[in-house]
Every structure is written in structure tokens, then in C-alpha cells.
Curated annotation (Swiss-Prot):
Source organism superkingdom: Eukaryota
Pfam families xrefs: Pkinase (PF00069)
Keywords, ordered alphabetically: ATP-binding, Kinase, Nucleotide-binding, Nucleus, Serine/threonine-protein kinase, Transferase
PROSITE patterns, sorted: PROTEIN_KINASE_ATP, PROTEIN_KINASE_DOM, PROTEIN_KINASE_ST
Keyword Transferase carried by entry: yes
Cellular component aspect of the GO annotation: cytoplasm; nucleus
Organism of origin: Pongo abelii (Sumatran orangutan)
Compartments (UniProt record): Nucleus
Cross-referenced Gene3D superfamilies: Phosphorylase Kinase, domain 1 (3.30.200.20), Transferase(Phosphotransferase) domain 1 (1.10.510.10)
Listed name of the protein: Serine/threonine-protein kinase PDIK1L
Main location: nucleus
Catalyzed reactions: L-seryl-[protein] + ATP = O-phospho-L-seryl-[protein] + ADP + H(+); L-threonyl-[protein] + ATP = O-phospho-L-threonyl-[protein] + ADP + H(+)
Entry binding sites for ATP: V14, G15, R16, G17, S18, Y19, G20, V21, V22, K37
Family: Belongs to the protein kinase superfamily. Ser/Thr protein kinase family.
């Protein structure tokens, strides 16, 4: 054990999910603000999700301005803490790995185990809240598209498939805004859950994320690609999710989440009085023609074509993250009226 003295002071709770609580905190020595995610390791599924995120975040050797950065991960057992590192031979770390692999608790259940992820603090809420509290703005739309495509290209270059890309998992940082002319910085967060490797186990062995097939059920219905519904997918599923997000952002398409009753940005297909996720509808009818734009009278031809390709039923017909980034840059800077 390293220390029983807290390094961070928790200020307030800023978010709560199915397997963790996020706090705004300050580093005692520097007073710098950070976000701290506290994950209780009381069930094998919690441990597995936490370790996946830790392995993905810690595998990234460089930083990107639009991807959340993991400062450190701290493992707590009762009142004692230690810094956790990938590949550690610490008995506590190995117990968590064993729990994840076996699907059953491999440590004394009477002890309280927690993982604390210390990350960038984002002060502007999430992309969903930010956009829906403001009028549509072409400059903001352009900035957000370019930032998201850059983040996705970076993740895929680092063999990371997000698997749950949606506006709620994209955070807003406004701390560096010097003037009202600057757009906020986006940070892709939660998810980052799968590091692809040729062996499936060695993160140091690179492989194309577009050839790394996954089968674990992941994602949120309205952003899931057809092949995710089937349970056999690659990184092209992230391209589909981003297509849903961009289409919804440009046209301000929203739906009401049936559980939370919250209004969310997201595209869908209408079937009678029902709204159906695009991916689910395409799984049932791969030849279905998507009506784009659905609310506006018109849309720039190149933008419309790109969104349709991102939402292709066949993942092989979608651009990869690197082509997507290039094409969005070309549309943003070469087509002066791209959004109309």
C-alpha cells in the first residue's frame, strides 16, 4: 500500500451512471480542478467495465485535445490506496483481473474495493445539453463535426473502438475560451472500451480496427449500427454512431428517452406512429432509403452523401475514420454553403 492520505478533495457530484459516480475535485497540492470517477467493485460486471476503460485509456501513449485524458487510476481497499498501472503485479490489481476473467468475486467481499479514475474536468456539461439549450449555429456545427471526426480518427489509430458514441458521452470544456468567438472544446469520454490487437490480448500488437471483429453487446439503441444489433461488428460501428449524431445535430432531430424522459439528439426512422432506431430499421430492411434531410428543405449535396455513406447498412460501404476526417475538412473549408 502506498498511502492512506487523500491526494484529492471532492467538491461536488456532477454525474451518476449505472456503474459509477463522477465528482468535481481539486488536487490538494496545486488546487487544479479534475474530474474523479468513483467505481465500486462489488460485482464482476462493474469490475470488467472499469478495467476495460482503464486498459483503453492507459494504452494511449499520447494525448488528443478531443479525447478525455486519464491522469491516473487509484485502487482503494477500505481506507488504503495505491496507484494502479497496467500489467501491475499488485495482488489487489490481480484480484480485480481474476474477477473480470472468471465472472465472480476473487477477493474478500467484506472489504470495500473502489477504483478512482482521475481525468480532465469538463465544465460545460455534455454535447446534448449544450446544443439543445442554444439555437442552431452553423459555426458550432462545423467545429463539433471536425472535433469529433478528429477524436475518432485518433482513437482508431490507437486501436480503440469506442462502442457507445452518443451526445451524452461527449463532454464540453469551456475553461480555455478567451473570447466569445471561440467554440468550446469537445472531449469524447465514457466508452473507450475495447483495445484491438492481433492476438486479442496484447495491446502492443497493432491491428486495423476495421478488421477487428467484436461480439459483445454494447451501445445505446438509437446510435447502434445494424451489425451491432446482430452482435458481429468492427470500428465501423463508431462511424455509424457518429453519422447519427451529425445528422441529428444538423437538423436538430430529437427523441424522448422512455426511461429518463429526457430529450436527446438522435436520428430515427418513423414506422407508423412509432420511432425506430436507424440501425434496427436497416437490419430489417438493408435496402431502405434514408430520407436525408428529413426536416430541412435542402442540404449540401456532399454533406448529404457523406451522412448516407456513414449510415450505410453494409459497414464496408462506410468511410473509415481517416477518410471521414479528410472529407469533413474538405466540406467545411471548401463548401462555403455546406449546411444549406
Amino acid at each position: 500500500m502506498v498511502s492512506s492520505q487523500p491526494k484529492y478533495d471532492l467538491i461536488r457530484e456532477v454525474g451518476r451512471g449505472s456503474y459509477g459516480v463522477v465528482y468535481e475535485a481539486v488536487i490538494r497540492k496545486t488546487s487544479a480542478r479534475v474530474a474523479v470517477k468513483k467505481i465500486r467493485c462489488h460485482a464482476p460486471e462493474n469490475v470488467e467495465l472499469a478495467l476495460r476503460e482503464f486498459w483503453a485509456l492507459s494504452s494511449i501513449k499520447s494525448q488528443h485535445p478531443n479525447v478525455i485524458h486519464l491522469e491516473e487510476c487509484i485502487l482503494q481497499k477500505d481506507g488504503m490506496v495505491q496507484k494502479m498501472s497496467h500489467g501491475s503485479n499488485s495482488s489487489l490489481y490481480l484480484q480485480l483481473v481474476e474477477t473480470s476473467l472468471k465472472g465472480e468475486i476473487a477477493f474478500d467481499p467484506r472489504s470495500a474495493y473502489y477504483l478512482w479514475f482521475v481525468m480532465d474536468f469538463c465544465d460545460g456539461g455534455d454535447m446534448n445539453e449544450y446544443l439543445l439549450s442554444r439555437k442552431p449555429n452553423r459555426k458550432t456545427n462545423t467545429s463539433f463535426m471536425l472535433q469529433l471526426s478528429s477524436a475518432l480518427a485518433f482513437l482508431h489509430k490507437n486501436q480503440i473502438i469506442h462502442r457507445d458514441l452518443k451526445p451524452d458521452n461527449i463532454l464540453i470544456s469551456q475553461t480555455r475560451l478567451d473570447t466569445s468567438d471561440l467554440e468550446p472544446t469537445l472531449k469524447v469520454a465514457d466508452g473507450l472500451s475495447k483495445v484491438c490487437s492481433a492476438s486479442g490480448q496484447n495491446p502492443e500488437e497493432p491491428v486495423s480496427v476495421n478488421k477487428c471483429f467484436l461480439s459483445t453487446a454494447c451501445g445505446t439503441d438509437f446510435y447502434m449500427a445494424p451489425e451491432v444489433w446482430e452482435g458481429h461488428y468492427t470500428a465501423k460501428a463508431d462511424i455509424f454512431a457518429l453519422g447519427i449524431i451529425i445528422w441529428a445535430m444538423l437538423e436538430r432531430i430529437t427523441f424522448i428517452d422512455t426511461e429518463t424522459k429526457k430529450e436527446l439528439l438522435g436520428s430515427y426512422v418513423k414506422q407508423g406512429t412509432e420511432i425506430v432506431p436507424v440501425g434496427e430499421a436497416l437490419l430489417e430492411n438493408p435496402k431502405m432509403e434514408l430520407l436525408i434531410p428529413v426536416k430541412k428543405k435542402s442540404m449540401n449535396g456532399r454533406m448529404k452523401q457523406l451522412i448516407k455513406e456513414m449510415l450505410a447498412a453494409n459497414p464496408q460501404d462506410r468511410p473509415d475514420a481517416f477518410e471521414l476526417e479528410l472529407r469533413l475538412v474538405q466540406i467545411a473549408f471548401k463548401d462555403s454553403s455546406w449546411e444549406t
